[in-house]
Structure formats: structure tokens, C-alpha cells
Amino acid sequence: MKLKKFFAGVLAAAMMLTVGATAAFADTPAAITHNQALTATSEIPLYKTYEVKNGTAPAETFSFQVKYLQVIRQDKAATAPYNTETVINLTGKETAFGSMTKGSESKSFTVTPTELGLGNPTGTGKYLYEISENAGQTVATTYAAPVYMAVTVAHKVDATTKQIKNGEYEYYV
């Protein structure tokens, strides 16, 4: 009986030490970071990584399309930038890679809120876009699956008075 109590006490002490030790050695929480506000002409970088696992790949230029999908939420005054499922023309938004032997390389291109149809908003809202890679003709190349991007249009706020600036907007991705 005494042996059972002894082991129960050791187990309880070990459990308390693990909880206490974890808290004692924990780092301070990371500082909260906020996305920077963008303007209608701010460049939003989009990245493409070209990876060759085996062999040599020929030079290739990847092109992309952006499709406006839907409004996630918007105020009553706002109008959507496009009809649902509208493909936005991104002529000249390609990434070119030279011939490569085993390895990977990343490049980027940019889009702006104006190119996404949000240059002259009529109100606040959150809009969803699909970015997809146009499939090329290179043998043994797997083209990337679509990715999604949400863009939020918010009222610009005066830094001093903290009041909304009517008719002025900022963007968050």
C-alpha cells in the first residue's frame, strides 16, 4: 500500500514538473504583425517555382490567368468589380525560366488592385480571385493547381483623427 502511494506521489510530482517546466521555459509570444495597407497601384507579387527533379528541362515561359470568382462580403454601396467567373486579361504577366538541370528556381510577377478591377471602388468589400497557370505543351511537366487570393477593400482612416476618409480606400491581400 505504501509503495502504491509512493509511486502515485512520484507520478503526480512528475506531471506537475512537466507542466511547470513547460511554462518556465516558454518563449514570449511572437509579436502580432499586420498586413500593410496597399493602394490601387501597389504591386502584389505572385510567385512561381520551377523545379526539375531529374534530368534536364528545356527553357519555358509560364503564363497565368486570374479569374474573379465572387464577392465574399461587401457593403450596400459597393458594386462588384466584375460578373462572377470573369477572366481578367493579364497580358505580359509571364515568368520565363531558362533550361535547367535538377534543382529549382523561383520568379515572380505582379498584379495591382486596379488590374483586378478594384481601382475605383464604390464601397468596402472582400473579393475572391482564382489564379491559375495556363498549361503548356512541355512533356513531363506538371503545371500548378490554382491558388486563391482574397482582396479586402477598406475605408482609409485618418491617422490623427481616426476618422474615415470618405471616398478613399486601401487594400489588403
What would you call each of these model-derived segments?
Residues 2-173:
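Solvent-exposed loop/turn and edge beta-strand elements of beta-rich ligand-binding domains
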